[in-house]
Amino acid sequence: MATEFADTTTHAFVYVAADDPLAQPLLTDLALEYHSRYGSYFGESASTEISRYPVDAFAAPDGAFVVLVRDGIPIAGGAFKRFDERTAELKRIWTAATHRRQGLGRLVVAELEAESARRGYDRVFLTTGPRQPEAKNLYLVTGYTPLFDTALTPDEVVIHAFAKSLDARELDIPGITAAHYSAIRREHADNPRFVALIPESD
């Protein structure tokens, strides 16, 4: 169900539960896109990734799930969950294929950042994969710091992690990077193929 709105010209942001029907087009489309781009690259199905976190991970007070609608139709969206006490992790950022190249991804990221700040977080963190260059470019142009060597090829980096401060404090890049690798190994402990893709250290 919708809990709050934030109007932006002809669009509206609707905050919902991750299992709300309004969120399902986003999750279904993401699963299809992950499958088409990665197949068995990570040693697990796209549906496994989409269902990795419980619904309440994206619920208040620690998280949120937002859908950008136009005339009641979901056209973009995203979510965040708690990474640590200071950091929100952005997830599930999506724009419908029929509405891309309209700047909607930037709107979603900005809304997630604003809501993260309202929830008390002072920095945000996110990851994307080697076969999503559009996502990488989106985060670079919206002020995110890459936590990887940008001189490497996408397949050498594998998991592209980014962070951004929401206030004037300087980012603790080594600390966030170490926490990122630790979280990946923990969350994918049952998938040795995935863990093998992750560097031992930064």
Predicted segments — roles?
Residues 36, 40-70, 199-202:
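Active-site rim helix/loop that mediates acceptor-substrate recognition in acyltransferases
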Residues 72, 103, 120:
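Conserved G/P- and acidic residue-centered "switch" motifs that form tight phosphate/ATP-binding loops
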